From Swiss-Prot:
Keywords: Cytoplasm, Heme biosynthesis, Iron, Lyase, Metal-binding, Porphyrin biosynthesis. GO terms for biological process: heme biosynthetic process. This is Ferrochelatase. One of its GO terms (cellular component) is cytoplasm. One of its GO terms (molecular function) is metal ion binding. Fe cation binds at residues 204, 306.
Amino acid sequence: MAKQAIKRAKILAVKNNNKIGVLLINLGTPDEPSVPAVRRYLRQFLSDPKVIDVPSLVRWIIVHLCILPFRPKRSAKLYQKIWMPEGSPLLVYSEMLRERVGETLGDDFCVALGMRYGKPSIETALKKLQEAQCRQLIVLPLFPQYSTSTTASALEEVRAKNSFKEMTVIDRFFEEPHYIDSMTTLIHENLNEFQPDYFLFSYHGLPERHLVKSGCQLAICNRKNNCSPISSSNENCYRAQCFETSRLIAKKLNLTDQQYGVAFQSRLGRAKWIEPYTDKYLIELSKKGIKKLMVVCPSFPVDCLETLEEIGIRAQSQWQRLGGETLKLIPSLNAHPQWVNAIAKMAKKSLQLF
C-alpha cells in the first residue's frame, strides 16, 4: 500500500508539474566565529521562549544582562577551534546532506534546508520550495528525539511561515530502523581501527522541567536510572527516547548493559538538567578503570560545536587528565551514504500520510 501511495503521488506530481518539497531543519549556527556574529546568534536562540521557558521579563534579564555580555566572547573562541575553511561545520555538512538527499530522491522532489536560528532561515527555505512550484511539503527536523526546545520550536516557526495546504511532519525518528541502522553502520566502520573498553552515548541535555512539560510522569521515573522502555506514559519524554535509541543501537552492536552508558551534555545555567551529566560520567568511568572510551552523540546527526569542540576537544582533554588513554569521538552521520538513503526512505514513507 505504501509503495502504491508513493507511486500515485509521484505520477500526480509529474502530471501537474508539481514537485514534492522536503524541508530539512537544523538548529543553526553563527555566520562567522566572531564575537558580534555569535552575539546575534545567541540573542535569537536564547530569546526563544521554548528554549528559556520563563516569563518574558525574566528571560530578557537572563539573556541581555547575564549571558550576552559574557558568553559571546567565550563561545567565539570555541567556534574558532572548529571552524572549517568552507564555514561552520554544521552548515557545511547540513548543506552537503541536503544536496545528496535531493540527488537520491530525484527530480520529483525539491529539498531545502532551513535553520531555526540564523541563516538560511526556515522562511527562506519555504520560499525556495514555493518558487520551485512544490504543492506538498514534508518537514523533517533533524532532531531524532522530540523535545519542545528543538522540534516543537522549529515546527512552530514552520507553521507561522508556511503557506502549503498539504504538509506532513516527521517530528521524531529516535527508533526509526533506518536511523538506527545508519548509526550502527557508522559505529562499526570506526570499530575497525579502535576497540574500546566502553561505549558512551552522549546526548544534548535539557532542563529537567522541560520533561515535566512534555508529559513525563514523575510517579514512574526518578530520572536517576535508565528510563523504562517507551510506552504511552513516557512516549513524549526526551530522556526516555534517548535511552531507547541507545538500547536499540546497543542491541545491534551486541553490547551488554555493562558495556555502554548514557549521559547528557551541554547544560547551561544553574537550573537542574537531566542526568547523568557527561563530564561527571567520565569521572565515574575513570574510577572504574576504563581506559579506551568510544563516545557516540546520537542526538546530533550533523557535527557541530557540541560534538567537535565539547566532546572532541574538551572531553578529550578531561579524559586524559583523568588518566584515560583514548577517547574516540565517532563522527556524526553528516552526509553518510546510508544516512542519506535513510532520510530519502523516511520522506517517501511519509507520503502515505497526505
